[in-house]
């Protein structure tokens, strides 16, 4: 085995990648990049019954979205391909048959009916379910419906050093004679992962904690096949806020769902890195470069990580605020075009959106929130109750007088920019013996149709002279029609 660090992310396309799965990919990627090694993607598509169309594409889309580039794998190739297990079946059958020939595995002819009945009886006796080794010493040959099982050593222990958990020991007698080759000729995970990790010269296996009980099986296979095993590190579970296993009842679990909800890839990389790893007890925001520099297995926790949705939203808001206006605009447009009011306005373009984004950038936590905060800056189809133009401390006529005075002052401006507008409207409030907030509130409703909106004068500048004055004129007309 080479001294080079070679790690793999080996998802099964039996569903769309969830956050725990992608967290595993990211820790492998960070470990490879930190050590100057290789990150390999291998698609473990041997479970044909549970195979989901589109799952592979979703896996690769998730990796690409997060910027987790791979050195070998689908779309890249490499010296150790193919990188789909369904294209490597001959290797697994070869290994399984060698183990049978050497007396380390055997054909099992037990029917599914017998196995089901045996399992039911074991459960009824409150025994741990497992194969009773009926065919272990029968020297059976291959036949239709037969599987190949591995002969577990019936004595002794299997001990290994987990790079996160330290020394771990399992009693061999408590292990099952597990299936390594199914009746359809496809391998189980246990055999395929061992054969491929050896063939692809994987140096370290970083995987979810749920695979820890399988490790003795894999180490026995390595020994039986005469392979040198990689080093193992089992990553902590991710739990929901209620400390139960993270699931759909806590919220979205698919990585693509977070993309569609308007989370940034930078946020997700940062946030997922902190689910089980910490640089210190206070730093929470890391650039990709810093994560690569700081990441090490010594700082990965043994205990489960808690998924904090509030923290994710906070972090996403922080990252949104670091974006330049053009960058935010380009990311915002796919979300804004889903809003019919904005899409129909004819103003959804990059240049205009670049002007709009700074108005609301400080107020959002997700890109999906943008449209509701700015649709009225795009669309002229704004509606409101004209009575809302009347300040609560003024009469209708006093409010109308104030709006007319503001319109005249704005119409006379040489430069229709935020600074000029405020320089002329703020003193006008004093002249009218109003508080600035009273006059600003009437202008906000008149120009946007909203009681709460982005900064007033900056919004009016983006709307432009013609649209802004047109809206205020319309407000004056609507207010005039109300009874005094």
Curated annotation (Swiss-Prot):
Per the record, the major location class is cytoplasm
Record's InterPro entries? Answer: aa-tRNA-synth_I_cd-bd, aa-tRNA-synth_I_codon-bd_sub2, aa-tRNA-synth_I_CS, aa_tRNA-synth_I_cd-bd_sf, Glu-tRNA-ligase_bac/mito, Glu/Gln-tRNA-synth, Glu/Gln-tRNA-synth_Ib_cat-dom, GluQ/Sye
GO terms classed as biological process: glutamyl-tRNA aminoacylation
* Enzyme Commission number(s) of this protein: 6.1.1.17
Quick check: keyword rRNA-binding in the entry?
A: no
- Drop me one GO molecular function for this one: zinc ion binding
**Compartment(s):** Cytoplasm
Motif position, 'HIGH' region: 11-21
Domain of life of the organism in this record?
A: Bacteria
Q: Does the keyword Protein biosynthesis apply?
A: yes
Give binding positions for Zn(2+). 108, 110, 135, 137
Catalyzed reactions per annotation:
tRNA(Glu) + L-glutamate + ATP = L-glutamyl-tRNA(Glu) + AMP + diphosphate
The alphabetical list of record keywords is: Aminoacyl-tRNA synthetase, ATP-binding, Cytoplasm, Ligase, Metal-binding, Nucleotide-binding, Protein biosynthesis, Zinc
| A Pfam family recorded for this sequence | Anticodon_2
Motif interval(s): 'KMSKS' region: 245-249
Gene Ontology CC, one term: cytosol
Residues recorded as binding ATP, renumbered to this chain, are 248
Family named by the database record: Belongs to the class-I aminoacyl-tRNA synthetase family. Glutamate--tRNA ligase type 1 subfamily.
What assembly does the database describe for this protein? Answer: Monomer.
Q: Do you know which PANTHER family this protein is assigned to?
A: GLUTAMATE--TRNA LIGASE (PTHR43311), GLUTAMATE--TRNA LIGASE, MITOCHONDRIAL-RELATED (PTHR43311:SF2)
Q: Which NCBIfam families match?
A: gltX_bact
Q: What does this protein do?
A: Catalyzes the attachment of glutamate to tRNA(Glu) in a two-step reaction: glutamate is first activated by ATP to form Glu-AMP and then transferred to the acceptor end of tRNA(Glu).
Protein name (Swiss-Prot/TrEMBL)? Glutamate--tRNA ligase
Species whose genome carries this gene: Dehalococcoides mccartyi (strain ATCC BAA-2266 / KCTC 15142 / 195)
What gene name is given for the protein in this entry? gltX
